[in-house]
Amino acid sequence: MTPEQIVRKFFEEVRSGNNPDYSNQLMAEKVLAHQIVSEEEQTVCRTPKDYAEHVREMIEVYGNFSLEIQEFLVQGSKVYVRWKQVGTHLRETDGYQPTGLPIVQMASAVYRIEDGKISEYWIQIDRSGIQNQFDFNKNLNNI
């Protein structure tokens, strides 16, 4: 598969929550995950199993969320994806009790493919936007 096909399949099967365990077909044994939180970069090492569990945790918190790819660019072994994820706040997260209201997440990542698998990625998530929604929904439920 080409880098484009690998990342598209990753989003269709794994990141979407449709088949998290398919991560073992598309991800290297150890993947460097560079995560931008505010202006601070954190790098963690993820395995396909870890990533599948991460997706299952998202499903527990946000239900069967929708995921829409808004931009998809390929340059050699790197693939850039920007997406919108919409779920329902069903479980406590980040100190916020569930509201049953929608939560929209905007995010983007660059995936690097090596030997036919995702071996590294750099991800940015609009955490401030998510925080604002949690605060707004909390106040809305307190009215």
Label every PLM stretch briefly:
Residues 1-143:
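C-terminal and inter-domain tail/linker signature
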